């Protein structure tokens, strides 16, 4: 007899072997119908997989996150089924799950059109309506190869070649269509009703631009119709907030083919940039940082010594001059070590906090570039703290407090924390990594925050804490980082004189709050839908006259506002006031000021905030109100 322990601690006995589906059926008809898969001793399995020894078992349903991901994965297979029925010559490649969805890469003779995607979605719905069972058959390697050879699925054969150690493959049969996967998958297509294909894109085989271009069909799938509907609404809202669209509408920036991944900032966009940079500079000065500037281009030997050449050269731009090879810096850290090394440092100098709005370049694949979110040229709000091991926890705590306060100022109150651990390709010994990872765990504990851990996601030189902000649409963006590095100070010979007059290596904390300023501005645009808070808006007020009679008074109002530190623009065009209000509304300025004869006579201004008419206000009172609004945002949050 088999003893099966359920999540509530109860134990059920069965004849051996038994499947998850059979266990669910023995508990109740409702659970049997809802069972997508199972978790046996912590491992996900198909509902049809046999259990042959005493085990702990959890029935996975669409209410579980794992259940939703299995539904999405099975929807990817369903894309394959529909595509092969409609386009028999297409070659199926891979179809993984991604956040909130899935995709399938497909090799075709000619690119799919939006009409093709609509036809594929319609055929998927027809197949779901057939309510067929998805049948899993563990198939010997040689037989799996034969199946895909007969079907002409060359990419599946290449994938099998990548797995020389695998003796049997999970083959999932959707009627006549067969796909290969580790699984698990849904037992029946009835679980796949709440799906939608969302977009079409190109993708290179294995992500390498030297390889052939494939067609990538993206989709999403959910447990319920309401969840699908809510997701589609979020996507539609995200499209309205797209920073590329708003960047053009608000006249902030543009990009063009002659400078891929580089941004042309327009006056309003650069004003926004300057507000952010100057605010960060003020905060960093108050927190004890010293601002520095390091070279853009340095000799290749310097990058070899730092370890970047071995670990990062594919992402670096290189150039040569006078028979010397140079690289454009992809990050600022080695330059900051040079400043630390330029002079004899004492333990009394620590912690030393060096900050730089450092301009970096990384040779990102052209297909990966995306507006401001993924660029080749960018500026980081970078800083490096050189300290002793005893100072790690206090410096991490101070950084955490600074970061959380700044995020609140920008309107982000929901911050989650992840700890990224050692990657496979790394510098430094395991002992050094053990020490670094434990140091960050202790720092996070001291900050009183909860965190999740991400194995394999650290930088090559050290583990890192990642800070993720949640925006107005509920999306998570990784912005801030804190990385602990024992490796780079060793490689570049950083040292200080201890209290006992010995030499010691400092610990190096790499940290950023905004990350790339370009990307952070993209996130801000989408979070605020282009309607920035007063303190942040590139133009805070526009002042409009009704007739030429008020033009001089408008200039006086603008001068007084500008003298008080506000970014105000004049609109004295000879147009009707209704037109000017509508025209300026597209730029989403926080305030519009209208001046007529009455306001001019009474030394007042008629104020509009977005679509709301606030009436006529005394100018000095209005200025005081604006100042209080900024104080509330930056000091009182």
UniProtKB/Swiss-Prot annotation:
Presence of the UniProt keyword ATP-binding in the record: yes
EC number: 6.1.1.3
Cofactor(s) needed by this chain: Zn(2+)
Chief localization: cytoplasm
Domain TGS: 1-61
GO terms for cellular component: cytosol
Complex formation: Homodimer.
PANTHER family, per the entry: THREONINE--TRNA LIGASE, CHLOROPLASTIC_MITOCHONDRIAL 2, THREONINE-TRNA LIGASE
Protein name: Threonine--tRNA ligase
């Amino acid at each position: 007899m088999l003893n099966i322990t359920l999540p509530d601690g109860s134990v059920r006995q069965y004849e051996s072997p038994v499947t998850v589906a059979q266990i669910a059926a023995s508990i109740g008809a409702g659970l049997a119908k809802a069972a997508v898969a199972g978790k046996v001793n912590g491992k996900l399995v198909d509902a049809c997989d046999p259990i042959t020894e005493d085990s702990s078992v959890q029935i996975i349903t669409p209410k579980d996150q794992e259940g939703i991901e299995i539904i999405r994965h099975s929807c990817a297979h369903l894309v394959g089924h529909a595509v092969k029925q409609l386009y028999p010559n297409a070659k199926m490649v891979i179809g993984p799950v991604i956040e909130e969805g899935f995709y399938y890469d497909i090799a075709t003779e000619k690119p799919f059109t939006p009409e093709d995607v609509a036809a594929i979605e319609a055929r998927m719905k027809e197949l779901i309506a057939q309510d067929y069972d998805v049948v899993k058959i563990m198939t010997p390697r040689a037989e799996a190869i034969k199946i895909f050879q007969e079907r002409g699925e060359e990419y599946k054969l290449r994938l099998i070649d990548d797995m020389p150690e695998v003796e049997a493959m999970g083959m999932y049969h959707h009627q006549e269509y067969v796909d290969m996967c580790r699984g698990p998958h849904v037992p029946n297509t009835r679980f796949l009703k709440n799906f939608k294909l969302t977009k079409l894109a190109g993708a290179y085989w294995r992500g390498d631009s030297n390889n052939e271009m494939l067609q990538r069909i993206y989709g999403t799938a959910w447990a319920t119709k309401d969840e699908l509907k809510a997701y589609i609404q979020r996507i539609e809202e995200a499209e309205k907030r797209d920073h590329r669209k708003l960047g053009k509408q608000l006249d902030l920036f543009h990009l063009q083919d002659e400078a891929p991944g580089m941004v042309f900032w327009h006056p309003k966009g650069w004003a926004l940039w300057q507000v952010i940079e100057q605010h960060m500079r003020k905060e960093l000065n108050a927190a004890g940082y010293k601002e520095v500037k390091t070279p853009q281009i340095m000799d290749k030997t310097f990058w070899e010594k730092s370890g970047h050449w071995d670990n990062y050269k594919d992402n670096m731009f290189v150039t040569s001059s006078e028979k010397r090879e140079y690289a454009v810096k992809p990050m600022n850290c080695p330059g900051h070590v040079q400043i630390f090394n330029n002079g004899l440092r004492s333990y009394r100098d620590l912690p030393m906090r060096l900050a730089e709005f450092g301009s970096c370049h990384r040779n990102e694949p052209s297909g990966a570039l995306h507006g401001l979110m993924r660029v080749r040229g960018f500026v980081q709000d970078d800083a490096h703290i050189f300290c002793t091991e005893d100072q790690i926890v206090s410096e991490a705590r101070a950084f955490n407090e600074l970061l959380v306060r700044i995020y609140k100022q920008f309107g982000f109150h929901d911050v989650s924390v992840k700890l990224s651990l050692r990657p496979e390709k790394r510098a430094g010994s395991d002992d050094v990594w053990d020490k670094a990872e434990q140091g960050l765990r202790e720092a996070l504990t001291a900050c009183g925050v909860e965190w999740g851990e991400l194995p394999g996601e650290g930088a090559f030189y050290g583990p890192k804490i990642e800070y993720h902000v949640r925006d107005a649409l509920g999306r998570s963006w990784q912005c801030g980082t804190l990385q602990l590095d024992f490796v780079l100070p060793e490689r570049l010979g950083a040292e200080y004189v201890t209290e006992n007059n010995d030499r010691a290596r400092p610990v190096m904390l790499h940290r950023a709050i905004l990350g790339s300023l370009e990307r952070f501005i993209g996130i801000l645009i989408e979070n605020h839908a282009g309607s920035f808070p007063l303190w942040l808006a590139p133009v805070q007020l526009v002042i409009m006259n009704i007739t030429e009679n008020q033009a001089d008074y408008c200039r006086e109002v603008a001068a007084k506002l500008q003298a008080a530190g506000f970014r105000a623009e004049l609109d004295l065009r000879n147009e009707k006031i209704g037109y000017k209000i509508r025209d300026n509304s597209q730029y989403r300025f926080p305030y519009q000021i209208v001046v007529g004869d009455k306001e001019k006579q009474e030394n007042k201004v008629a104020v509009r905030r977005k679509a709301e008419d606030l009436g006529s206000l005394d100018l000095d009172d209005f200025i005081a109100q604006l100042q209080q609004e900024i104080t509330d945002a930056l000091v009182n949050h």
